[in-house]
Amino acid sequence: MKAFSPVRSVRKNSLSDHSLGISRSKTPVDDPMSLLYNMNDCYSKLKELVPSIPQNKKVSKMEILQHVIDYILDLQIALDSHPTIVSLHHQRPGQSQASRTPLTTLNTDISILSLQASEFPSELMSSDSKALCG
């Protein structure tokens, strides 16, 4: 009778793993810098793919995400307005379409409103408006 260990032996370099190009990757806890570089690569790829992002200008990650959201919404609108899709929606009545305003538009509107509110003479504003704007 042969003695064997209850613990499975681990082979470090399996031929099948090498031939398939499979390698054990480190977890983000093992290498936090690789995770950071990977995220930066993802942001760079998003910057390349979204046509409204200026390529020759440095933009923040937040701006990239806002452009991506706007682009997705624009694609959704284009898809929803495609004749084939429109005819499918007419076949299924009773479903409402929720249209969203892009975040950049909302942010711009809020900025404009706050600037306009600061230009009003204080005697024209109610106490509620002063609390909201001030």
UniProtKB/Swiss-Prot annotation:
Keyword Nucleus listed? The answer is yes
One GO CC term on file: cytosol
As for subcellular location, the record says: Cytoplasm; Nucleus
Matching entries from SMART domains are given as: HLH (SM00353)
Q: Where is this motif: Nuclear export signal?
A: 106-115
GO MF term set: protein dimerization activity; RNA polymerase II-specific DNA-binding transcription factor binding; transcription corepressor activity; transcription regulator inhibitor activity; transmembrane transporter binding
What does the UniProt record tell us about how this protein is modified after translation?
Ubiquitinated in a ASB4-depedent manner, leading to proteasomal degradation. Phosphorylated in vitro by CDK1, PKA and PKC.
Q: Where is the bHLH domain?
A: 23-75
One Pfam match, given by its short name, reads HLH
The answer to whether the entry has keyword Cytoplasm is yes
Q: Which UniProt keywords apply?
A: Biological rhythms, Cytoplasm, Developmental protein, Nucleus, Phosphoprotein, Repressor, Transcription, Transcription regulation, Ubl conjugation
Q: Which residues carry this modification: Phosphoserine?
A: 14, 25
Q: Domain of life, per the record? A: Eukaryota
GO BP terms: namely: adipose tissue development; adult locomotory behavior; astrocyte differentiation; B cell differentiation; bundle of His development; cell maturation; cell morphogenesis involved in neuron differentiation; cellular response to lithium ion
Q: Subunit structure, briefly?
A: Interacts with GATA4 and NKX2-5. Interacts with NR0B2. Interacts with CLOCK and BMAL1. Interacts with IFI204. Interacts with NEDD9/HEF1. Interacts with ASB4; this interaction promotes ID2 proteasomal degradation.
State the protein's purpose.
Answer: Transcriptional regulator (lacking a basic DNA binding domain) which negatively regulates the basic helix-loop-helix (bHLH) transcription factors by forming heterodimers and inhibiting their DNA binding and transcriptional activity. Implicated in regulating a variety of cellular processes, including cellular growth, senescence, differentiation, apoptosis, angiogenesis, and neoplastic transformation. Inhibits skeletal muscle and cardiac myocyte differentiation. Regulates the circadian clock by repressing the transcriptional activator activity of the CLOCK-BMAL1 heterodimer.
Protein name per the record: DNA-binding protein inhibitor ID-2
